[in-house]
């Protein structure tokens, strides 16, 4: 029973994350290779950590952390 519930939560999280990425693209997001987003992501994470931690905010934090992680990986690769 726990495995099914965990699987469902992971599935819901995946789709919520995907929907957030699509929403950002529609608002002009050009991809995580655009360095101008780095400061915005850091600010958004700090702002969201002060808010109620609901599902939407956790998805947003996870997405912003993913973008920041990608910046670090690209820097290691010399991009």
Name each model-derived stretch.
Residues 1-79:
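Flexible "arm" and connector segments at domain edges
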């Amino acid at each position: 029973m726990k495995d099914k519930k965990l699987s469902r939560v992971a599935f819901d999280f995946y789709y919520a994350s995907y929907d957030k990425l699509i929403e950002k693209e529609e608002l002009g997001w050009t991809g995580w290779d655009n360095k101008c987003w780095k400061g915005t992501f850091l600010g958004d994470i700090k702002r969201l950590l002060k808010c109620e931690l609901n599902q939407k905010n956790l998805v947003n934090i996870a997405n912003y952390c993913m973008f920041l992680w990608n910046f670090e990986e690209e820097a290691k690769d010399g991009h």
